Structures are given as C-alpha cells and as structure tokens.
Design a protein with these regions (language model features):
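A short alpha/beta connector and helix-capping loop motif
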Residues: 5-8, 145-155, 180
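Mg2+-dependent endonuclease catalytic cores in nucleic-acid-processing enzymes, primarily RNase H-like
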Residues: 155-288, 304-311, 315-332
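ATPase catalytic-site recognition across NTP-hydrolyzing enzymes
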Residues: 64-136
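Gly/Thr-rich phosphate-binding beta-strand-loop-beta motif of the actin/hexokinase/Hsp70
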Residues: 127-151
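A short acidic (Asp/Glu
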Residues: 18-19, 143-147, 210-217
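ASCE P-loop NTPase helicase motor core
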Residues: 1-64
Length: 332
C-alpha cells in the first residue's frame, strides 16, 4: 500500500515553541525515530496495538545553498540579529529564541555538582535548620502546581521537589477536586525524607481564599484529614517577574540566588519556554503553561531580594544544533 506520512517545517520561537520542542526536539537526538504505542479496543472486545513514529531532522540556512547563492546578503542579515534571534534563525537553536522572558536561564549538566553558572543542579541533603516553603497554584481543567523550596542562610532558594497535576499532555489538568489535591500534597510530604517532619510554610494563589461562591478552596484543603494550611501569596505580577530576574542573575562566582534540582522536570520544561505577551509587553503571555511560574512567583514574593550586580556568564561550548549536548541555554 501507499505509505502515508506528514512533513512539517518550522522555526524556533513563538507561543508554540515549547510544544514543538517537547514533542520533537527533547525526546531523542536528531535523526532518531521516536515511536509511541497506542492501544485501541475493537468492537469484538479485543485490543489492538498501534504505533506512530516521528523524527526531528535539524536544518539551517547552510543546508540551502541555492538561497545563499540567490541572496548573498541574507546570511549577513541573520548574523546581525539580536543574539537570541540569531541563535534560533541562523543556527537553529531551540534553546534561545525571540520573545523568551528568562534569557538568563542556563541548564548545564556539566556543572550540576559544583553548582556554578547553572540554574539546574544535582539534589543534595537539605540541612534541618533551613526554612521550607510550599508554593501552590490551583488548577482543575488546567494543571495544578505545587513546588517545595528550601532557603539557605544567605537567602538563596532551591526548588527541591514538585508535584504537577497534569495528564501527561502539556497544559491538560487531572480534573481532581481540592480535597484530593490536598491529600496528594500531604502524602508527598509524608513520604519524602527531605520534607517529612518539617515545618512547611504554604504560600498560595490568593484566589483560593475566595468565598463568594461557597466554601473556599483553602478551607476545603484545611479540613481533616489533610490539615493543609496556606497563606495568601502576593500576586503582583510585574514585581514577581522581576524577582525571577533578580534571582536568576549570576554573581561573580557563578552563583545565582535561585536553583532547581534536576528532578523538577516540569519546571525545567516550562520556565525557559515562557514568552512575552504581545499586548502587555512587560508581562508573560498567560495563554501558556504558566502554572509553575505562578506558584514559584508567590514564594519569591514571600522572600524578595534587591536588584543584584549583573555578571556575565562564560560562553557555552559551540553546539548550535544540540548534536552533542542535549541541554544548553543562552544568556542574553
């Protein structure tokens, strides 16, 4: 029979950037088929296993000599763009793109252990005297997000654990009620050695305290047997975004004021992909998967810091198509 397939082309950037990257770029090295298996129940009650495959084929302007020959100035036009756009459109990088909010973000696996010049680090044992915070953004049809944070003696925050209520599809929630969400949060804290037995300060979206339509979400979560308590977070959006920028900045020793355990996969997946709102250019586009961002923002606003002195991070190794290293982020 006829082989049916689809070819799709795109450039990095835009609101769909994160979806394309998660589906085609991140799961496997370039040129490696990604196969998914599906089960279909037939009318006679039997089940049939079906497969779908996809593959990412990297390409850049250098693969189109005809275009370069017809328009010799095109290469110079791409090279003259701002750094983020140049990396995306000239070199095909999916880790840096126009409109990216947190251009400071860096994820360098080679530095996970020494914790320098990277925001993602290897997990470590949290000292008993460190304060623990729990951030929460409620969701039903959209994901709910819970993040646990440890604060060291210098005020540096570490995201040490997360609970993200999604189906496995980006931005699709589990549709579970507040009581069940509270049960899962309490269970996570009781079963994790980093959290068990600690005093945890919960900070949440102030909307969960709304009683205009009956019992509030906060009250439901505080009931027996979960006894989960929250304080309303500061929801000032632009000030919260600036706290992100302040904390992501590296000092002269390569240490930021905010780092993330590499086990927090959904934070690492969603935060670098956030883009600006075209209508409100100082804020992020809220149509994105921004639930982790919101939940983290409440915790940062509970622990505000002053604007730091900016220090430039060292350049990453040149690997624009990610052929040898699967995680690199440019700081603009």
């Amino acid at each position: 029979g006829t082989r049916v397939y689809m070819r799709a082309t795109t450039n990095p950037g835009g609101i769909g950037h994160g979806w394309v990257k998660a589906r085609f770029i991140t799961p496997a090295p370039p040129g490696t088929p990604i196969t998914e298996e599906y089960t279909v129940k037939l009318p006679d009650g039997t089940e049939q296993k079906l497969q779908r495959a996809r593959v990412f084929i990297p390409s850049s302007i250098f693969d189109n000599p005809a275009l370069l020959a017809n328009d010799p100035g095109y290469l110079a036009s791409l090279a003259s763009m701002p750094e983020a756009e140049k990396q995306a459109l000239l070199y095909g990088s999916w880790d840096s793109f126009s409109g990216q909010v947190f251009t400071e973000w860096r994820n360098d696996p080679a530095r996970y252990e020494d914790q320098r010049w990277t925001h993602v680090i290897a997990p470590f044992t949290i000292p008993k005297h460190w304060q623990i915070y729990r951030g929460f953004d409620f969701g039903f049809s959209k994901p709910f997000s819970v993040g646990w944070y440890a604060a060291d003696e210098e005020g540096r925050l570490y995201r040490i654990k997360e609970l993200y209520g999604c189906t496995g599809r980006p931005n699709e929630g589990l549709r579970i009620d507040p009581v069940e969400q509270a049960r899962r949060i309490r269970e996570a804290e009781q079963n994790d050695p980093l959290l068990r037995g600690r005093v945890i300060h919960g900070i949440a979206d102030p909307a969960i305290f709304d009683e205009s339509r009956g019992e509030s979400i906060a009250a439901m979560m505080e009931r027996s047997p979960n006894f989960l308590r929250w304080s309303p977070g500061d929801n000032t959006r632009l000030a919260g975004k600036m706290q992100f920028h302040y904390r992501l900045n590296f000092d002269a020793d390569g240490r930021p004021m905010f780092q993330v355990f590499n086990t927090c996969k959904h934070f690492i997946r969603t935060i670098p992909n956030l883009v600006y709102d075209e209508s409100n250019v100082e804020d992020i586009d809220t149509r994105q998967e921004d639930h982790i961002y919101d939940e983290c923002r409440y915790v940062l606003m509970e622990n505000p810091i002053s604007p730091p002195v900016r220090c430039a991070a060292p350049p990453m190794p040149d690997d624009p198509l990610n052929l040898h290293k699967r995680a690199r982020f440019y700081r603009i």
